A protein has these predicted regions:
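Mg2+-dependent prenyl diphosphate-binding active-site environment of isoprenoid biosynthetic enzymes
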Residues: 18-259, 269-281
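N-terminal amphipathic/basic leader segments beginning at the initiator methionine
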Residues: 1-17, 285
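Generic C-terminal helix-cap and adjacent flexible tail
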Residues: 265, 282-285
Length: 285
């Protein structure tokens, strides 16, 4: 079920990328190279699942929101891989963007993908102006100096300051955008308030499992096995150990599922969220 659902989400988002970036240029090619690379599209899946809680948006708007969030995610991956950052040559099993297109073009492609996310939301004719403002406020906070960018800076600092809080780093680098995936299709403030802390914990669990897989199975992640070691990178596994990392992630997902089951009344939304959360723990890449 989860593979079919995420494949359907990925197909819709990929088509939106291709249709929106069909004007041929080196920049659009570089943008599509990372955006269309093999991936789980988990964030898009969460957008599609949570959209069913209220069922207030058109299909086009849901696809645009999902694409915007995946665009921000792709931008962050391109910039994270740069020589000045994590200096990774591989991403998703293929050469990183800066290896394929050069460092300068990769930087520009990342910049363009960030702008493209806001362009998608601003240009959506089905979304109300008030909802557009809420979405733009949410995703700009997620990817900005209080979100992913701050998390990346803390991640870089942690190479020389091992006492940095790994949970805070993961919450900023991963949790913030996953929170956006959970709440940007919604309008009800009580539902948003309920889902936000759950979403941030799910983001932490996702990144913990990434840390586990980078330790136990890096090739299946499509990354260089020596990358984190070379960069002296702080991870949940290096700080707490492999066994605690797995146990903590499983407990987070178990608690998240229980909270969702007690609150979410739409069976379709709940079942899809349950399988996505379980997939986070069970995934191998």
């Amino acid at each position: 079920m989860i593979d079919d659902f995420l494949a359907e989400c990925r197909e819709k988002v990929s088509l939106n990328f291709q249709n929106s970036l069909k004007e041929k240029s080196k920049i659009s090619d570089a943008m599509l190279y990372t955006s269309l690379a093999p991936s789980k599209c988990l964030r898009a899946g969460i957008v599609f699942a949570t959209s069913k809680i209220e069922n207030i948006l058109s299909e086009r708007s849901i696809v645009n929101i999902a694409t915007a969030i995946e665009s921000l995610h792709s931008y962050s991956l391109i910039h994270d891989d740069l020589p000045a950052m994590d200096n990774d040559d591989l991403r998703r099993g293929i050469p990183s963007n800066h290896i394929k297109y050069g460092e300068a073009t990769a930087i520009l492609a990342g910049d363009a993908l960030q702008a493209f996310a806001f362009q998608l939301i601003a240009g959506d004719e089905d979304l109300s102006d008030s909802h557009k403002i809420k979405i733009i406020s949410e995703i700009s906070n997620a990817c900005g100096f209080k979100g992913m960018v701050l998390g990346q800076q803390m991640d870089l600092d942690a190479e020389n300051e091992p006492n940095e809080n790994i949970e805070e780093i993961h919450a900023l680098k991963t949790g913030k955008l996953i929170r956006s995936s959970f709440i940007t299709t919604l309008q009800d403030e009580n539902t948003i308030k309920f889902l936000s802390p759950i979403a941030e914990q799910v983001g932490l669990a996702f990144q913990i499992i990434d840390d586990v897989l980078e330790t136990t199975n890096p090739k299946d992640l499509g990354k260089n096995s020596e990358s984190d070691i070379r960069n002296n990178k702080l991870t949940y596994v290096t700080q707490f150990g492999l066994e605690k990392a797995v146990t903590d992630a499983e407990l987070i997902i178990k608690n998240a599922n229980l909270q969702l089951e007690n609150k979410i009344k739409n069976d379709d939304a709940l079942s899809k969220l349950n399988v996505i959360l379980n997939y986070i723990i069970e995934r191998k890449n």
